[in-house]
Amino acid sequence: MESYLDRLEREKQHERNIYNSENILLTKNDLFSILDKSGMDYSKIEHKIHSMDISEFQIAFNHKSYCMYNIKISSELKEEAKSWKIPLQKVSNERYEFLGDSVIDLIIANYLFDRYPKEKEGFMTKLRTKLVCTKTLAKLSSYLNLTKFIVMSKYVEDMCEGRDNQKLLENCFESFVGVTYKLFGFDFCNDFILALIENVDLIDISDLIENDDNYKEQLLKYSHKFFEGRNPVYKQLSVEGQSNHAIFTMCVLVPVQADKLVIMAKAKGSIKKDAEQESARIALDKIKRNDFSAIE
C-alpha cells in the first residue's frame, strides 16, 4: 500500500511533468490549412473565419491533463504556470467531444441511408461502426494533422505514445467536429466529414464492406459452430498506468471443451475493446492452424 510520503513524492513528480514545451495553439492559418486538407469547399464561410475569434476551436484541442480544474498543483506552481508559453487552460475539450461524437454518428448514418437505399439495417450498422470506430477517426485526425495542436501535459504525452495515441486522436477529431457544428452548423459539418469519407486515398468503403475485421464476432461464430454453441470469454489480466491513460492487457478464453476454457491469446491496448479485438484475432489465427494450446 502506498505510504503518505510516497504519495506526496508522486504528486510532486506529477507536478514537475505538467508543462509541455511541445504544446502549440491553433491559429487561423492553421484552421484554414485543416479545411484545405479536408478537400471541402468552405468559400461561403471563409470571410467569417477571417473575422471570428477562434478560441472555441482552440478549446477543441485542450486535453484535461492541462486544465486547471482537473489537476491539483501547489500555489508555487500556479504562480510559475503564469509565465509558461501556454498557460494551464480553463476548459477541456470533453463537452465538444461529446457533441461531436453524436454529430458524426448522425452524418454517417444519414450518408449510408442515402447511399445504400436497398440495404438492410444490419448492413448499415456494421458499416457505420467501421466508419466511426477509433481506428478510422484517428486516421482522419492524423491526416488533418490535428495531433499537432493537442494541448496536453508532458506526463500524459510521455505515458501514452505521445501524439500518436489512437484514442487521443479520435477524441480530438470528435471535439473539432463538435466546435465546427456549433459555429458553422450541420450542413457545413456534413460537407466536411463527407469530403474526408469519400476521399478514396483515405478510406476505401468497398474494402470496409468486403473485409470483416470484427474478430470478436468471427471468433464468436466459430465458437458456436465448432464448440457446441459455447461463447468465448474475455477477461482483464492487468492494467498499467493511471485510470485516464491506462494500458489494458486482455485475454480471451476459448471453450475448446464443455468443461474446459483455454486462455488462447492475450493483447494490450489503451482501449479494452481494442485489446479484446486483437486477442480474438490472435486466437483465430491459432485456431486456423489447429493450435488450441493455452498461453502462459
Regions found by a protein language model. Give the residues of each.
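Double-stranded RNA-binding/processing signature
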Residues: 1-296
